[in-house]
UniProtKB/Swiss-Prot annotation:
Its EC number(s): 1.-.-.-
Matches recorded under InterPro entries: AOX (IPR002680), AOX_sf (IPR038659)
Gene that encodes it: STO1
Full protein name: Alternative oxidase, mitochondrial
Pfam families from the UniProt entry: AOX
Residues that hold Fe cation 2 according to the record: E198, E249, E304, H307
Length: 357
């Protein structure tokens, strides 16, 4: 029987007409939305200037009234991986947590992240605050002072890299499953979900601002180098690749925690009354058309915290034999087990002895 996937009526834009199209590949019916002539007429050219210095790394933030004018209005399909609901209370509880390296491989993975982060910080003009004075001052008057454009650049570059590991790892495991004629025990699905989620972060940010050509060039080079290196390292030792990604997600949580503090303290006035892009409240189920930039960043930080937990957990498992504990919830267990939400979390990852595998 064919199944029909529908979006919530509250999230249909005015002027959009649903049209059902059959997808032969998946055997499902999907709603696709097509812009009407009236919608195109009512969607004038954005006011934000497209002129940028080719060597300027800052992202040009769209005017508050321009945000919706950059929405994609044609052939919009549903997210392949529906996002779980995160409450505001649970999102506010998320914070930076560090898993101390325990083995030589852990130390190498952590040192690798420190090297990558140091280079990334230098290019984006960012300095991680270490004291309360640093947090309060925001490095005002120095090259490390973060503006709305610099924050968007950092987030866009971070998400363009963070979406690589899940895609590469799932591809390798897919080939491994085909080659050895056996099931993958749900690793592929979780890794694909992670890659998809990171890409949704990126697609959301590019609807808020336009990155410069210099930033785009760095993304091209960075993705090409990182993707190939991660592919080779994952073939050699997937365990420590997951540990590497766990530490990468720790830094992502740290970055977004700093971002949240700057929003809460009113240091980013351009973001105070901004309208979040349509793609955001169509993807995160608890967001609405009236949600704030702070609400959005809290959800993105929560996503990164969940990726941190997932990858630190996967690094603790037997890469060939153990199942992915996030792929299936086993009922009637007295001990808590991993889940896709934020109610039960372990920032340092679940140890193998704690899991029902």
């Amino acid at each position: 029987m064919l199944s029909v996937q529908t979006t919530r009526a509250a999230k249909l834009q005015l002027g959009q007409l649903p049209s059902i199209a059959y997808t032969a590949r998946s055997g499902r019916l999907h709603h696709q939305f097509y812009s009407t002539v009236a919608e195109k007429t009512a969607n004038p050219t954005p006011n934000t200037s497209d002129k940028t210095n080719i060597f300027d790394i800052r992202t040009k933030v769209y005017d508050e009234t321009d945000i919706r004018k950059h929405d994609d209005n044609q052939f919009i399909t549903h997210p392949l991986f529906p996002h779980p609901t995160f409450s505001q209370e649970d999102c506010l509880k998320v914070g930076y947590e560090h898993r101390p390296p325990r083995t030589f491989g852990d130390k190498m993975a952590f040192r690798g992240i420190e090297l990558v982060r140091g280079s990334f910080d230098f290019v984006t003009g960012y300095k991680k605050p270490k004291t309360q004075a640093d947090i309060d001052s925001g490095f005002k008057g120095t090259r490390y002072e973060m503006t709305e454009g610099k924050w968007l650049t950092r987030c866009i570059f971070l998400e363009s890299i963070a979406g690589v590991p899940g895609a590469v790892a799932s591809f390798i495991r897919h080939l491994h499953s085909l080659r050895l004629l056996k099931r993958d025990k749900a690793w592929i699905e979780t890794l694909l979900d992670e890659a998809f989620n990171e890409r949704m972060h990126l697609l959301t940010f590019i609807k808020i601002g336009k990155p410069s050509w210099f930033t785009r060039t760095i993304i091209y080079v960075g993705q090409g180098v990182f993707c190939n290196l991660f592919f080779l390292f994952y073939l050699a030792n997937p365990k420590y690749c997951h540990r590497f990604v766990g530490y990468l997600e720790e830094e992502a949580v740290s970055t977004y925690t700093h971002f949240v503090h700057e929003l809460q303290s009113g240091k980013l006035p351009k973001f105070e009354n901004i309208k979040i892009p349509t793609i955001a409240w169509q993807y995160w189920p608890e967001l609405t058309e009236n949600s704030s930039m702070l609400d959005l960043i809290l959800r993105i930080r929560a996503d990164e915290a969940k990726h941190r937990e997932v990858n630190h957990t996967l690094a603790n498992l037997d890469q060939r034999k153990d199942r992915n504990p996030f792929g299936l919830a086993i009922p009637d267990l007295k001990e808590p087990q991993p889940e896709s939400g934020l109610k039960v979390t372990k920032p340092h990852g679940w140890e193998k002895e704690e899991l029902k595998l």
